[in-house]
Amino acid sequence: MNNRVHQGHLARKRFGQNFLNDRFVIDSIVSAINPQKGQAMVEIGPGLAALTEPVGERLDKLTVIELDRDLAARLQTHPFLGSKLTIYQQDAMTMNFGELSAQLGQPLRVFGNLPYNISTPLMFHLFSYTDAIADMHFMLQKEVVNRLVAGPNSKAYGRLSVMAQYYCQVIPVLEVPPSAFTPPPKVDSAVVRLVPHATMPYPVKDIRVLSRITTEAFNQRRKTIRNSLGNLFSVETLTEMGIDPAMRAENISVAQYCQMANYLSENAPLKES
């Protein structure tokens, strides 16, 4: 028996498809999402509707974004969900979530079992729309969830941690074994809740500057910041900000990265592109 086939659909490697089939896990995720009628619920990657069906049962309308043409067609003819669904057959990386929120007249509640091969770039895409999003619940590779929630002074702490925590409160929900999927992935999975901050705890003047600093620092994470960020900050400047130049990227808090970004915005702003 081909373990890549589930409900008559062959899981496609190029789309990173692993289909959730464990009823206990599905019920736990739906309980965590807690969908309510009247909310602008949006599912990314509904696949074979493991989450779509129990969430859709509670709603009058549900928006789904599915790249796979065959799966989108199956959803259109779903026996009891079809009439409730608005289906976008496209890559979620190309979706303008700000426009979708304006169309639906309220902030979005986004959820999904995300393809692991695009989960990190998709996170960054969604972060740019957090003013249009109420919350997000995602199944991800456990290692990615560990990176999202990691704090300074840990190996998992990186650029994704800083940017996620800049935009959102990040809350791990539950861990999921490979046996909950068809085909079983080679890694453990986990569900995470991301809630955009109502008020930014560490507002930055130019998000591009924060992005640049974190990229340069973590691309050379074994170097001290006097070296990795030496082209942006002098030792004296770092010391004046109360930041030890001998620290490495993983030792610097989100608040300190934001402090550095604001200093640079005020003293060496990026040119408009």
From Swiss-Prot:
Disulfide bonds: none
Record keywords: Cytoplasm, Methyltransferase, RNA-binding, rRNA processing, S-adenosyl-L-methionine, Transferase
Family matches, as PROSITE patterns: RRNA_A_DIMETH (PS01131), SAM_RNA_A_N6_MT (PS51689)
Subcellular localization, as worded in the UniProt entry: Cytoplasm
Positions bound to S-adenosyl-L-methionine: N18, L20, G45, E66, D91, N113
Family per record: Belongs to the class I-like SAM-binding methyltransferase superfamily. rRNA adenine N(6)-methyltransferase family. RsmA subfamily.
Name of the protein this chain belongs to: Ribosomal RNA small subunit methyltransferase A
Organism per entry: Salmonella choleraesuis (strain SC-B67)
Gene from which this protein is expressed: rsmA
